[in-house]
UniProtKB/Swiss-Prot annotation:
Organism field: Danio rerio
CDD domains (UniProt xref): WD40
Pfam families listed in its UniProt record: WD40
Annotated PROSITE patterns: WD_REPEATS_1, WD_REPEATS_2, WD_REPEATS_REGION
Family affiliation: Belongs to the WD repeat POC1 family.
Coiled-coil intervals: 431-463
InterPro entries named among the record's database cross-references: G-protein_beta_WD-40_rep, WD40/YVTN_repeat-like_dom_sf, WD40_repeat_CS, WD40_repeat_dom_sf, WD40_rpt, WDR55_POC1
Compartments, record wording: Cytoplasm, Cytoskeleton, Microtubule organizing center, Centrosome, Centriole
WD repeat coordinates: 16-55, 58-97, 100-139, 142-181, 184-223, 226-265, 268-307
Name of this chain's protein: POC1 centriolar protein homolog B
Amino acid sequence: MASVMEDPTLERHFKGHKDVISCADFNPNNKQLATGSCDKSLMIWNLAPKARAFRFVGHTDVITGVNFAPSGSLVASSSRDQTVRLWTPSIKGESTVFKAHTASVRSVHFSRDGQRLVTASDDKSVKVWGVERKKFLYSLNRHTNWVRCARFSPDGRLIASCGDDRTVRLWDTSSHQCINIFTDYGGSATFVDFNSSGTCIASSGADNTIKIWDIRTNKLIQHYKVHNAGVNCFSFHPSGNYLISGSSDSTIKILDLLEGRLIYTLHGHKGPVLTVTFSRDGDLFASGGADSQVLMWKTNFDSLNYRELLSKHSKRVTPDPPPHLMDIYPRSHHRHHPQNGTVEINPVADTQSTDPQVVEVGRVVFSTTDARNYDGASSSRAQFTSGMDSGPFRTHTQAREEEDENQEERFAGGMTASPAERSGIPSSLTSTLENIVQQLDILTQTVAVLEERLTLTEDKLRTCLDNQVLLMQQNQQLDRSDEESEGPPL
């Protein structure tokens, strides 16, 4: 294996979403990539050659976040529809859904043990949930504006969050208290995450910067301003030595954190880059953005360097309190600006290989453990863009006809017909029921608001009546005093 770093290369591109790509995450087994989009669908891309991709439908608004459970058997998605869904990333397409917030849910993230979820929302709160029962555990409520992102530390003892109040906050999951606040932004803090060792957190901002803080000393140790527009996302390499970032300037940057410098600028997207993520082994990373395409890159980093680190990290037992692993250098909090020595890569699009065939699946299993979290909305079928009758893009009817013709061959190996076919429920009825449930939810919220207003009105009326009684009593006392002072008539 080569000991000299090679340039990153574009391995594959995936097309199947019909709108902006907003989020992405690799399965820990390194065999799947999940992406969420403004087209309200979740896509599971199987990375094996010629493998089919799955499109999951169920959310009723933009998908904002996606994260695989450590086991790889579940994938969570968050949405502007105020819900979180837990999907089985297979042809079965089953999902459970619960209402998580009273406004858009911006991000979702599993703890390392897979037992908890943390969500961030435009309702200014961060919430933690039990995964098994979809049960609300506790809320963190110190942000004063929309919360854009929340992440567990590698050991699960801390949560980092950031938002439009221009702060990055650190929370203790035991005491549920905010233990530190980092405020050094000229705009919204857009993304936050821990490095693999848990010693540092990084945050990106609308002010074009990426900042790395040592949470043991509470000091800013690195400050990068290498983009020409706001930084929307970033991802730490598993070794902790590198960081990739995506920006509204349409570029992806790769930073060498040990040397504290920009080493690569990658071009490939047309429009803002909204999501980047490394695979768990660090060999691949994916990017997505406003051009509705997903690009998968091979890192080609010096494997001899970081594989040794990964093996040491995986063997470590940590009885000592975190953070416990390598520090990030340099310690000085100087700025890093674009350098002339960096390499710019303009990959050539692969026009020979076809995009994977997309199978539409989606079956909702509602959470019944907590009625307050029920957001009844059954999945509806999304149609492919019409007019594309050849190549990897097919209409829903054409895909269904082809699937019927090759059913035995295609569903060999344990795969079965789609859930809609098994249930026999017409899509029109499903859509109607979904609309009814949404309207009922709106009516419930409206009634709750009216009840609150009625209660306030009653309280104010009661106060007015009490004040009126007091005034009458005072007037009566004044009248008696006047009569007594005047004395009896002559």
